[in-house]
Amino acid sequence: MKKTLPILLLAVVCGFSISGLPATAQEAGDVRPGIAVRAGADRMTIGSFRDSYTSLGFNSYTLEWDFITRGEAGSYSAAYNLPVFSIGLAYNGLDEVKFRSQNGHYSGMVAAYGSISRDLVRFGRFSFGYDMSLGLSYSDGYYHPVTNRANWFFSSPLLMYVAGGGHLTWQVASRIDLIADISVRHNSSARFAYPNGGLNYWGGGLSARYHFSDRPESGRNGVRTPRISDDLYEKGWSYEFYAGGGVHACAAEWLATSRTVDKETLAATNLRKWPMGSLGFDAIYRLSGRFGVGVSASAFYCSNMEALRWADGIIYGEEAASAASYAPFSFGAGAVQEVFYKRTAFYLQEGYYFYRKSGIHADHGHLYERAGLRLYPRRIEPFFFSVCIKAHRFKADYMDFTVGIRFK
């Protein structure tokens, strides 16, 4: 794992570079972005299950390479108020956090991520806006049923990293900015492994940015939305068919296994990774260059019915498990929204199962969600690909990798 980690982190960084940074900057009205470097420190505190700890605070340090977009009226850059795209590294000193139980600990965590920072309002030398980040983290202080039992928040060394927050920027000099920020951050195994309670923390701090070239002129205060000229955007309906898949670590199987074997045996047990699949159809109406809304129909395949039936028998008794229904296919429909920046879209779906039979323990109700990124590369259109988190009532089910085709 130590040898493959740099390759995985590099892949994440390259992925964000391809999807949202200068590689896509050749749309109408865009010009070459400005380049800057940013370094900062934050004081963070654990934000959930706080009674599990005796010490909550830790320091976080970040280093970013920033791309400051520049665009004329009619460009996506101008429509988003000249956002900053970044690739960065963060170190979270989680080893400072102390568990109440002696059988629990964290270690330092390193994250590689891509981010977008967008100003909402500018006034003189000051600006205020929001930030969003997505990437991967690595830490060797994960769950172990014998040596780290109290840390049930993540159980694999490689984790998803998600962050969001706000910033206040002061242009101190022609090429220097001071930035105060607050953020909420999340790490989890994304159901590649279990247990997977998720690690949530929040805080704030200060950073400094140095521009290697003159900063772009905004020429306005606040936000306005000019007409976007991009051949991907045509107001009206589009239709998308897609298929995807991923893997899932079964919570019910882990819980039942932990009740039937001792801790040493559980430590040597590799929880099975169950294949998951999906088929979908979206009808989306493009309201503007930045927004689209629509409806969707989905079918899902879950291969872990055998594990669910066995686990329900252990947890609830054989009689209850025999009376429950188990079917690998489920069907649902819902609403979707896409928020576009050039040929990248943030995709959000809220759905309702009208058919789902998953036994007792895995019956999380009728609602499901999908959230992630869709990429529409010009060279392979009308095909697209995406990565998203499939969830039940906002609890991760699996990471879904999809490919699809788009028609107008």
Predicted stretch roles:
Residues L63-T69, A112-R118, M132-L136, V162-W170, ...:
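Residues on the lipid-exposed face of transmembrane beta-strands in outer-membrane beta-barrel proteins
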Residues P33-V37, P83-I87, F126-L134, L178-I182, ...:
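Transmembrane beta-strands of outer-membrane beta-barrel proteins
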Residues N200-V223, A396-K408:
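Outer-membrane beta-barrel "beta-signal"
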Residues A39-T45, T69, L89-D95, L134-Y142, ...:
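Transmembrane beta-strands of outer-membrane beta-barrel pores
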Residues R43-T62, K98-Y106, A249-G280:
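Surface-exposed strand-loop-strand hairpins of Gram-negative outer-membrane beta-barrel proteins
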Residues V31-P33, S55-L63, N81, G104-A112, ...:
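Residues that define the transmembrane beta-barrel architecture of outer-membrane proteins
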Residues A73-S75, G124-F126, W170-L178, D214-S218, ...:
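Repeated loop/turn-to-beta-strand initiation elements of outer-membrane beta-barrel proteins
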Residues G47-Y53, V97-N103, G141-R149, A190-G197, ...:
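Outer-membrane beta-barrel translocator domains and adjoining extracellular loop/strand segments
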